[in-house]
């Protein structure tokens, strides 16, 4: 009888330690269902994520999101465009409700979550980004390139420009 009590107490302690050791991570950050998209024209994009944990029966009870145009401020946990603070809820995807987004701008964001059964937050997710596009036709600044006003003629022209960069290229697009 005494050994049964000891075994029960040890089982409960081991289970408690397992729950305490379980790590919860936020992964697969998406904006409009895409990973780090560019050219978004949505003024209120939808943000989503996946919670990965070894804890059985885990249920997200709250989240916190920070969004800003500067990666360093997001790394510091501050966002210039949207800081939700603690929001109770499990809603995913979440609609962006921060300051208006500017066209042709890259925004960085991260999220952390809290479970329903304790008050511990997960670690912050890795930083993700999304980049806005034109947003409105009034932001169009280019002119059409063409070789003839006659639309019955020939295939499209081929444009190219070769160049040499003296520095390492960090990002490029055409």
Predicted region positions:
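Pro/Thr/Ser/Gly-rich low-complexity, intrinsically disordered linker/stalk tracts
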Residues: 22-56, 126-136
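Well-ordered beta-strand positions in beta-sheet-rich domains
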Residues: 28, 62, 93, 124-129, ...
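Exposed beta-strand and adjacent loop surfaces of beta-rich binding modules
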Residues: 28, 46, 60-64, 171
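Short, conserved beta-strand segments of beta-strand-rich sandwich/propeller modules, principally
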Residues: 46, 106-110, 171-173
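Recognizes extended acidic, P/S/T-rich segments that occur
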Residues: 51, 58-106, 112, 116-124, ...
């Amino acid at each position: 009888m005494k050994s049964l009590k000891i075994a029960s107490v040890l089982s409960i302690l081991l289970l408690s330690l397992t729950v305490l050791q379980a790590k919860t991570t936020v992964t697969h950050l998406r904006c409009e269902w895409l990973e780090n998209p560019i050219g978004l024209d949505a003024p209120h994009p939808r943000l989503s994520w996946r919670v990965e944990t070894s804890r059985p029966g885990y249920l997200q009870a709250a989240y916190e999101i920070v969004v800003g145009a500067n990666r360093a401020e997001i790394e510091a946990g501050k966002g210039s465009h949207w800081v939700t603070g603690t929001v109770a809820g499990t809603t995913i995807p979440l609609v962006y409700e921060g300051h208006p987004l500017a066209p042709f701008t890259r925004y960085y964001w991260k999220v952390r979550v809290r479970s329903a059964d304790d008050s511990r937050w997960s670690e912050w997710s890795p930083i993700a980004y999304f980049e806005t596009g034109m947003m409105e036709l009034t932001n169009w600044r280019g002119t059409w390139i063409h070789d003839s006003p006659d639309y019955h003629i020939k295939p499209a022209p081929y444009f190219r420009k070769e160049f040499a960069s003296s520095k390492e290229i960090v990002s490029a697009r055409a």
